UniProtKB/Swiss-Prot annotation:
Listed GO biological process terms: methylation
Protein's UniProt keywords contain Transferase: yes
One GO molecular-function entry: methyltransferase activity
EC number: 2.1.1.-
Annotated protein name in UniProt: Putative S-adenosyl-L-methionine-dependent methyltransferase MAV_4444
Pfam families membership: LCM (PF04072)
Lineage: Bacteria, Bacillati, Actinomycetota, Actinomycetes, Mycobacteriales
Organism: Mycobacterium avium (strain 104)
Binding residues annotated for S-adenosyl-L-methionine, in chain numbering: 130, 159-160
Role according to the record: Exhibits S-adenosyl-L-methionine-dependent methyltransferase activity.
């Protein structure tokens, strides 16, 4: 499915299905005896979406021989990648709230359950922004399993291509208070100019002491669309509505660290490979790695 300026999705199709795939990875990482992350809500959310492929992936029941390029090593490298990514952003929020931040915004929140599972200090407000169907599904599913937010949770059912800053303000967001922003797993699905506009809007809403965390994928510049299209074709044969080659926006774009520094942030990054080493996880061989290549995880602080 080719992207359009006003395309929509649920959690079983298009960009939404990638959120479900990521949640399945978190569920598998949660079961890993190494115990790097703990997301008890990932599994029930994925089961509620009802895509058989992802349910079987969580349960270790996929017939990998029937799926092109799917091997136990590749699946494990994906799970490990989700583990270090989730751990990085979990730690980011803990550090931000330890520094006194009590206002959080999660952009394109998908099946993110941090508002329910992190130990937020009293008085913390977590704003979640995503398409209306995605927000409604997650809220209803977590209510059905008896989950309760560990912070004040406010949902903003709007696409990021809309006037989300106005919707955020209408929900009670205070631009005078420091904010911890998260844009996880988002940027590759934005055109280059939309990526810049996102950070421009965040900067305009950020008081000194605000922070932002995201990731940058240098490989999006020379994206191997053919390799990804072959992998996606195999997924679609098994009922997964994902064509990554048509979902992402490839080509030149500003490096996030440089762009944020130019807007008055102090940004720094760490590669996924470095995070693997930090947590004692084996770095996958290139043939088993993400087709996008290396990922840089970035955190930044608003300096003034």
């Amino acid at each position: 499915m080719t992207r359009t300026h006003d395309d929509e999705w649920d959690l079983a199709s298009s960009v939404g299905a990638t959120a479900t795939m990521v949640a399945a990875g978190r569920a598998m990482a949660t079961k890993d005896p190494r115990g790097l992350i703990d997301d008890p809500f990932a599994e029930p959310l994925v089961r509620a979406v009802g895509v058989d492929f992802f349910t079987k992936m969580m349960d270790g029941e996929l017939d990998l021989d029937a799926i092109e390029n799917a091997t136990p090593v590749r699946i494990q490298s994906m799970v490990d990648g989700m583990a270090v990514r989730t751990k990085y952003f979990d730690d980011y929020f803990v550090d931000a709230t330890d520094a006194g931040v009590r206002q959080v915004v999660i952009l394109a929140s998908g099946l993110d359950s941090r508002a329910y599972r992190l130990p937020w200090p009293a008085g913390t407000v977590v704003y979640e922004i995503d398409q209306p169907r995605v927000i409604e599904f997650k809220s209803n599913t977590l209510a059905e399993v008896g989950a309760e937010p560990t912070a004040t949770r406010r949902t903003i059912p709007i696409d990021l291509r809309g006037d989300w800053p106005a919707a955020l303000s209408a929900a009670g967001f205070d631009p005078a208070a420091p904010t911890a922003w998260l844009a996880e797993g988002l940027l590759i699905y934005l055109p280059p100019e939309a990526q810049d506009r996102l950070f421009d809007n965040i900067t305009a809403l950020s008081a000194p002491g605000s922070t932002i965390a995201t990731e940058f994928v240098p490989g999006i510049v020379d994206f191997d669309a053919e390799r990804v299209r072959e992998m996606s074709g195999s997924f679609r044969e098994h009922g997964v509505d994902i064509d990554m080659a048509s979902l992402v926006y490839a080509g030149e774009r500003n490096h996030v660290i440089d762009y944020l520094n130019g807007l008055g942030w102090r940004a720094e990054g760490v590669t996924r490979t470095e995070l693997f080493h930090r947590h004692g996880i084996e770095v996958p061989a290139p043939e088993h790695d993400d087709p996008l290549g290396e990922i840089i995880f970035i955190s930044a602080t608003r300096t003034g």
